[in-house]
Regions:
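Non-heme di-metal
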Residues: 1-177
Length: 177
């Protein structure tokens, strides 16, 4: 699969305009692969984000089409991040099964990682928090990884996550007065 595939699947308004870097690594590194497993399918991961945002969308009624569109498009962007991370983990010599690393003590992903929430406002705040945690986790990984290609990948994903923060903040401003 070419790296142009990633840009082709970007969601207008839900992904940064910056192109994704080429998905490559300096060489196999199981330690880096394990670090990325938490971003991929750990507790506060892309896999959790996808499922949390989809659930929040599924539980909406027809009167909130704008929120529904936002949650669906952000979840699709998070799926793209999962695909990018899976490819990177494979290149590093890892196996991108649905499990975390240190965040979940290596346990497989489960629906208990999702914060389901009980109202639109509560859900938006939970989603905003999840994006902040993801950004912090990516920055932590960048500080531990010495591979410039992986750093470029993570920095590019962070651009999308920061856009998601902005979208959730705007939605909170609109729906949580």
């Amino acid at each position: 699969m070419s790296d142009a595939h990633y840009d082709m699947h970007k969601r207008n308004g839900y992904s940064s305009d910056e192109p994704y870097p080429e998905i490559k690594v300096l060489g196999p590194n199981k330690y880096y692969a394990e670090l990325l497993m938490d971003d991929y399918a750990g507790i506060s991961s892309e896999f959790t984000s996808v499922n949390q945002y989809l659930y929040h969308n599924f539980d909406l009624d027809e009167t909130h089409r704008e929120l529904s569109e936002m949650w669906i498009n952000i979840s699709i962007t998070e799926m793209l991040h999962m695909e990018i991370l899976a490819k990177t983990i494979r290149l590093l010599g890892g196996n991108p099964v649905y499990r975390g690393s240190t965040s979940s003590c290596g346990a497989y992903w489960n629906g208990g990682f999702v914060c389901y929430g009980n109202s639109i406002c509560n859900r938006l705040k939970l989603d905003l928090h999840l994006e902040h945690v993801a950004i912090n986790n990516y920055y932590k990984d960048i500080s531990l990884i010495e591979d410039p290609y992986i750093k470029a990948i993570l920095n590019r994903i962070i651009l999308d996550e920061k856009l998601h923060v902005s979208l959730f903040e705007k939605a909170i401003e609109k729906y949580c007065k």
